[in-house]
Amino acid sequence: MSSAKRVKLSHSKAPGPFRKPSSGDRAAAKVLTKKITQAPKAAAPIKQKAREAEEDDDDDDKDDKDEEDEEQNDDSSDEASENDDSTPTVEEATKEGQTELPSKEETPTKSFRDLGIVEPLCEACEALKFKKPTPIQEQAIPLALQGRDVIGIAETGSGKTAAFALPILQSLLEKPQPLFGLVLAPTRELAAQIGQTFEALGASISLRCAVVVGGLDMVSQSTALGKKPHIVVATPGRLLDHLEKTKGFSLRSLKFLVMDEADRLLDLDFGPILDKILKFLPRERRTFLFSATMSSKVESLQRASLRDPLKVSVSSSQEKTVSTLIQNPLFIPHKHKDVYLIYLANEFAGKTTIVFTRTVNEAQRVSILLRTLSFGAIPLHGQLSQSMRLGALNKFKARSRDILVATDVAARGLDIPEVDLVINFDMPQDSMTYIHRVGRTARAGRSGRAISIITQYDLELWLRIEKAALNGRKLPLFQPDKEEVMVFKERVEEAQRHAREEMKALHEDRGKKGAVLKGRKRGSATKRRHDDMDAEEG
């Protein structure tokens, strides 16, 4: 075993050499699937390589531009209309005052090295099985490395986290300091997963990352912030609490701000809190804004927080879902919903599956139903404590449970890379929720399937979703043989009785404690408590 010393990021001088990740790395770094095998390199050569990579990219861009100019001169007489549609370079867009770069999805895929990422971070990407940049990474990373503010508009599951994490870590390597970057996320689960990504990418350089979210102890969070982490990932409300109440905590020296899922941040009415947070941050900073959509609210946030940004988008088609996603409606009578769900669970046994329900109560019941019939199901919803929500996610990611039964708390932003199937057990109420639900599968270029169970009560809703999310395109039906489905009917009825009894006991137990599970709403006096439902899951 190597006796090499562990070298940490310095705050007063250039960082020391990289080391190979050891088994003692923090828990988040355990997602590394293989060790970085190349010999460590000193920071000075890393900087030199980064500059050389950027110069090489600049030379390549100049050569490409010269070739494009020659082609345009040759064909200008008879292909003027095609020239009008050509993709401008960053330099052209900047010179002409243009702030949006069209999609380059037809451009041959580059490697992370081609984008200007330094070797140690490229090795970390390889260790995490990031084989090649996704379209949003390919477009956003070079702009970020050039020092520009960036707006990224991309389909859900496109790899946005690495698109901002890699440039921030590369800048941190060049000029290390505490409290270097801040990432704001709309949900606790997304914040936790962004933190895990940063720690995994920075495992070889002893990166310190603090995740600050609601539902957890503020004192322990204050202690973590007092240790001056390099990166802070937070939900807006809890971050503002610390900015206003935690002594000695300041972000006045911050270099990078990221607002991830910005449209969701504003949908959840975080706008006033974001305004307050911005007052605590320095004006001289770099800002990245990533969003699935570009609404008027997001545009207002952009004007308030970004300086002369370049906007990149990889959503080239009008259809809102990715091309690698197979979508099927399943039309059935309402009374047979449970039977068809069990048929699907059996048909796709062994596949990682998310089953979406509309209410907390139904998520609990369906989870019990599946477990009674020996399927590895676990619930995820807003009435679980934060630790239990993260526990459910970790079990699902680790494949110790292959079915996650969730309300829309899991529909947006969760980074679960390998979800094979999404089942809409209850139809969502609008097209955007549908898009974000089915976007949990077929992420970052992978294929996936989404099956929506549609009863006689959902037809009008489905037609609206079909028109808004699919531009009216008719999807192929999922049509199982009815006799094969009804084979499960008797066993499902027995499991339904068991689920009703268990739900009744749960309600009675919670009634005694003063916290009753409800389907759509919770009373203002209801407290969030640990959910005893899944205690047997460990």
From Swiss-Prot:
Establish whether keyword Transit peptide is in the entry.
no
- Short motif Q motif, span: 110-138
Please list the reactions this protein catalyses: ATP + H2O = ADP + phosphate + H(+)
GO cellular-component term (any): nucleus
Q: Where in the cell is it found?
A: Nucleus
Q: What is its EC number?
A: 3.6.4.13
User: Looking at the keywords, is Hydrolase present?
Assistant: yes
- Residue window of motif DEAD box: 260-263
Please list the residues that bind ATP: 154-161
Class of enzymatic activity (EC top level): hydrolase
User: Which SUPFAM superfamilies does the annotation name?
Assistant: P-loop containing nucleoside triphosphate hydrolases
Q: Where is this region: Disordered?
A: 1-112, 498-538
Summarizing the function annotation, the protein's role is: ATP-dependent rRNA helicase required for pre-ribosomal RNA processing. Involved in the maturation of the 35S-pre-rRNA and to its cleavage to mature 18S rRNA.
Q: What is this protein called?
A: ATP-dependent rRNA helicase RRP3
Task: Give the organism the record lists.
Answer: Pyricularia oryzae (strain 70-15 / ATCC MYA-4617 / FGSC 8958) (Rice blast fungus)
